[in-house]
Amino acid sequence: MSILYVSPHPDAFPSLRALIAARYGEAGDGPGWGGPHPRICLQPPPSSRTPFPPPRLPALEQGPGGLWVWGAPAVAQLLWPAGLGGPGGSRAAVLVQQWVSYADTELIPAACGATLPALGLRGPGQDPQAALGALGKALNPLEDWLRLHTYLAGDAPTLADLAAVTALLLPFRYVLDPSARRIWGNVTRWFNTCVRQPEFRAVLGEVALYSGARSVTQQPGSEVIAPQKTPAQLKKEAKKREKLEKFQQKQKTQQQPPHGEKKPKPEKKEKRDPGVITYDLPTPPGEKKDVSGAMPDSYSPQYVEAAWYPWWERQGFFKPEYGRPSVSAPNPRGVFMMCIPPPNVTGSLHLGHALTNAIQDSLTRWHRMRGETTLWNPGCDHAGIATQVVVEKKLWKERGLNRHQLGREAFLEEVWKWKAEKGDRIYHQLKKLGSSLDWDRACFTMDPKLSATVTEAFVRLHEEGVIYRSTRLVNWSCTLNSAISDIEVDKKELTGRTLLPVPGYKEKVEFGVLVSFAYKVQGSDSDEEVVVATTRIETMLGDVAVAVHPKDPRYQHLKGKCVVHPFLSRSLPIVFDDFVDMEFGTGAVKITPAHDQNDYEVGQRHRLEAISIMDSKGALINVPPPFLGLPRFEARKAVLAALKERGLFRGVKDNPMVVPLCNRSKDVVEPLLRPQWYVRCGEMAQAASAAVTRGDLRILPEAHQRTWHSWMDNIRDWCISRQLWWGHRIPAYFITVHDPAVPPGEDPDGRYWVSGRTEAEAREKAAREFGVSPDKISLQQDEDVLDTWFSSGLFPFSIFGWPNQSEDLSVFYPGTLLETGHDILFFWVARMVMLGLKLTGKLPFREVYLHAIVRDAHGRKMSKSLGNVIDPLDVIHGVSLQGLYDQLLNSNLDPSEVEKAKEGQKADFPAGIPECGTDALRFGLCAYTSQGRDINLDVNRILGYRHFCNKLWNATKFALRGLGKGFVPSATSKPEGHESLVDRWIRSRLTEAVRLSNEGFQAYDFPAITTAQYSFWLYELCDVYLECLKPVLNGVDQVAAECARQTLYTCLDVGLRLLSPFMPFVTEELFQRLPRRTPKAPASLCVTPYPEPSECSWKDPEAEAALELALSITRAVRSLRADYNLTRTRPDCFLEVADEATGALASAVSGYVQALASAGVVAVLALGAPAPQGCAVAVASDRCSIHLQLQGLVDPARELGKLQAKRSEAQRQAQRLQERRAASSYSAKVPLEVQEADEAKLQQTEAELRKVDEAIALFQKML
């Protein structure tokens, strides 16, 4: 047995780090070291078993006499699951190692230095403000990195996040108040996201962030660190402060200029915020936007997004017919067809829909730009149960009416009116998202064309016997008075006794308990009894048997016997069945076939009667008084009291359980026996599974194929009837034959049900079935409607009018791709495949790509009651916190839920949601998408992509100035032949971006595409190429300048085309301002060819190697300039190289270094030649070092004075740390985490001393 020894102290962050790693090891594939999960011990190991020296906590003993590992980094590394942050060569693994090292060497010392004074553990001479400044400095790199990253290395927590979060636990608990957390908003968001992960929460609980008020008890051992000061010491410190204040006042006086001397220029005032920039030129809807004027100073989403969409729509760019005589015209590029997952017409789209549409539209635009005949078909789903519930709530809220008071026809009129209003809003949202849908083909699942398909499908399947009528157990909502599907059932996990609100009950109802009671054995002289237990005691009134295991020795003597029901005049047989678990409870279970799925199956095997004891509203039936007519949960209390009164109650205890809740009504779902319509799924499921096995249907990510086969292999028949009014009314009729020779039928008897496309057709079929004339047949159509998923399952071909043949059906069915969230793989995707194969003989699509589910920044599921359901338009336009509140008040939430949602909104969006724009939202959502993982969406990251849009804007604006008004681009993008090294380099990098983008689209790897494009524009084009271009465009070499302009134009042209699928608005706006290569160029960017590797084949390894050297030198120079505060000077730089080849390369890129590093002269030293005196040195690569000239730019004497003071302070700090650690009581009294922090601080201080000594030596040579 492995043992993990940890400190019990709640702030012992090294031990917490190990415990959380152990939790991840349990949740994953086991600890990375391959051993078993360790046992936790909250104390130091026995001295007899510890190695020498004694290990620090946490410590891991890998089995008796086995290897000892101690210290948080090593222990966490071993306990963390393999492959989730361990060593490796991948970029993610390198990032993990980088951030773990940063946490251990930078964050922990800074965090302890800032926190310990706050806890009363300040050492002599320690400055709390300086410590806080050091913490801020350590947090800055994290803040920058997390601006565009959810986690430190990848899309899920790794060892890096674990190390950094635990390092910052103390500051977040005791130091960083709300104002500080606003400064480091990205760090705070990331910290909260991590600590709310289940593995963190299991160890840390709820982490309370510092509010500004502190109450801390001084820890044992603090007297070693901060002994109480004597009055003499306090007096001495006061004198020091007084002297310091006088000195500072004197310095301030000396800095003021003498009378008559010119005063320094006042600082420039910040530019006035121009406010919101809007497009105000009169442009009729559908007309092209006027871009002939000057570009605004900065990017504005409102300005950029104006007018483009109506023009795109009027021009027909989104139609598959665009640019060709008809959709059936042969196209060597092929056909791309995808139908939208029709959003429910239940209100507004949320960010989950926005993700779906961002991905789908990006794919659609990419295929369209590749020249394929492209159709993305829009539509809207009637969402039967969801829509009916919302409209019923609205009617009750506004008019105090329910649907039964209104009547079926009048109620349906209300739903249609509501649909017209909400359907338009959903389409408006889709257009604001830039979705390039063909709106002329928009469909609604209740449209006549689609309704005809639904009727045809039902009738065909019923005639073949695939659809049948049967009485079975269904999920029943007593509030909705309807059966509901599995996807409409939420499973609430309870750990024990819990009181839950249930609609229709004034008091909360008890769940999470197991009640035991006794059944007396019939005819037993010894008063023998069998004890059973249940979580639903009221259902014992429907018990028909008691079951035990056939091999249970305790009950063998009861074979053939019965027990007596205490409230009913019936005996219950004791049956023997393998499903019973002998080890659970008494090994005996009650059997209630009409109210439990397992019991129903036992009843079928033993031919037991199923007695329903609840009606559709949840009131008890078929039971004696006093239980008859009681609501089910009132009956629960009555049955319990009656059992106690008869002496049959045997106890109650907490019981972990799952309570099924209707996600529409929040009612507790009951399994009830009801006659319903079912679809036989066995054969269709086999065909769907085989299609994936053969490779005819491809499901991506491939991990979902396992789920697919599992579902198909274990599928049950599908209940498709719903007791609602809104939806497709089932085209089935109950038959009454007015002929004495034909006995009357009963509901479950399928022979007395007939289906038909019309009532007349159904009457003819019924007459033929019973051999009578049609006039002797009376028909009553089923009141129920079809499950929404039935009509949705027909959507890929119902939108084209199946079964009628049409041009669209022949061209676009089967479709190319189905893209949707992985949560509806079974409920929608599987049913489309099964029904498509059954009814058309074809798969509805060739590929299925399943994206992740959007959660909030803390990993929580989107829920209106949590206040984290975000309208994408609120991210696009921005919204105040009050605006978010107002939306809640206009919703159908209960008042209690509104208050809870307000709290969630205030916590997540205290300042509201900033305006981000459509392009930033789309790009951010696609950048988030990682195959197979859910998305914890943080709106602040979306704001970061708005800044990226501003970068595009400014870069293009600069480029247009550089190109000049008379610039004429070459007819092709082919190089001129006189390109400079940096021209060749940027073309090479552009080639790589084109390759990665196309490969990413083909593989549905959206993060790879967005990363490639973001990096090209920001880090290569803007940060490097444009900077290197400035001296060329301002120089005298006209050939070089013209080559540069042509290359720059190519970068803009290709770069905007690359980005267009993700950012259609800003790229169109900028593209329209560029000159065209030919007069016949397409009118819009959205129908311009997408860049392909064959067009952009300028890979140049030689140029890339040269610029990589230039960038390495630049980074080193910038680092030295920052170290010596040379922000306003251009120091000379001398390059020391290891060989002539490196020297030649360095000479070739020296001009680029000069531009990028803001250096003066950049010269390459001859081999072996010494560098000039007074240079600071840094290493750029293994073949090149740089010498930055400081002579004349800094005052050596002044710098030496500052360095000597810094050295003295560092020495004093090191001495204090050494003395503290040498104290006799240190190891016994000081907490272990403080000891580790002291050791890290000492190492950091010694490293600083070495750097200071090097700098002192340099400046002494300059004197």
Curated annotation (Swiss-Prot):
Chain span(s) of sequence motif 'KMSKS' region: 861-865
Chain positions with N-acetylserine modification: S2
Modified residues (Phosphoserine): S436, S526
Composition bias type Basic and acidic residues, residue spans: 234-248, 259-274
Sequence motif: 'HIGH' region, positions: 343-353
Residues annotated as domain GST C-terminal: 89-219
EC number(s) reported in the record: 6.1.1.9
Alphabetic keyword roster: Acetylation, Aminoacyl-tRNA synthetase, ATP-binding, Ligase, Nucleotide-binding, Phosphoprotein, Protein biosynthesis
Broadest EC class assigned to this enzyme: ligase
InterPro entries (UniProt xref): aa-tRNA-synth_I_CS (IPR001412), aa-tRNA-synth_Ia (IPR002300), Anticodon_Ia_Val (IPR033705), Glutathione-S-Trfase_C-like (IPR010987), Glutathione-S-Trfase_C_sf (IPR036282), GST_C (IPR004046), M/V/L/I-tRNA-synth_anticd-bd (IPR013155), Rossmann-like_a/b/a_fold (IPR014729)
Regulation affecting activity: Can be regulated by protein kinase C-dependent phosphorylation.
One GO-annotated biological process of the protein: valyl-tRNA aminoacylation
Positions with a binding annotation for ATP: K864
GO CC annotations on file: cytosol; endoplasmic reticulum; mitochondrion
Stored PANTHER family: VALINE--TRNA LIGASE (PTHR11946:SF109), VALYL-TRNA SYNTHETASES (PTHR11946)
Entry protein name: Valine--tRNA ligase
Source organism per UniProt: Mus musculus
Lineage, highest ranks first: Eukaryota, Metazoa, Chordata, Craniata, Vertebrata
